[in-house]
Amino acid sequence: MSRSDPPFAARQVIVVDDDPALRTLFIAMLERKGFTVDVAPDGRAAYDQISRNAYAAILLDLMMPDVNGFELLERLARECPALLSRVIVMTGASRRVVQTLDTTSIWGLIRKPFDIDELVNAVTACSDGRPRVPPPVSRAPKQLM
């Protein structure tokens, strides 16, 4: 993958999640909305696919075996930082874990469990090149004062 990546395919996305049931759900929902969907069970497989395809959006789970979402984000930041703006992190990790994530360079964050319409709307906005609307897409609980 080079730092000057080719233009992305407007409706092509990749879902990176180790849960086969969630991958199947994402395929069904996103294909119904006109997206072409590829899937990867971990960060290593995802990087291989990302290096060969120009995705409009990358849905990324953080907690996976082998190469996790944090490790994939680090590799993308080193090798092709422009792709980070196409990443939508989806996670059920604790707030403490999520707080270690730098959300300034990614498109957004969605907490699991999530509303499927919220996810589809986020993927559509990201793939259309629309900037995220602050605060990032999230169902995270408010901090206690």
Question: Which residues fall in each region the model found?
Answer:
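A Lys-centered signature of the CheY-like receiver
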Residues: 112
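Receiver (REC) domain active-site loop signature in two-component systems and cognate sites
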Residues: 64
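Active-site residues of response regulator receiver
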Residues: 61
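Charged docking surfaces used in two-component/phosphorelay signaling
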Residues: 24-32
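Acidic catalytic/metal-coordinating carboxylates
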Residues: 41-45, 68-72
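Hydrophobic/aromatic residues positioned on beta-strands within the core alpha/beta folds
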Residues: 90-91
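Short hydrophobic/Thr-rich beta-strand motif most characteristic of the beta2 strand and flanking loop
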Residues: 34-41, 49
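Non-catalytic signal-transmission and effector/linker regions of two-component phosphorelay proteins
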Residues: 1-14, 117-145
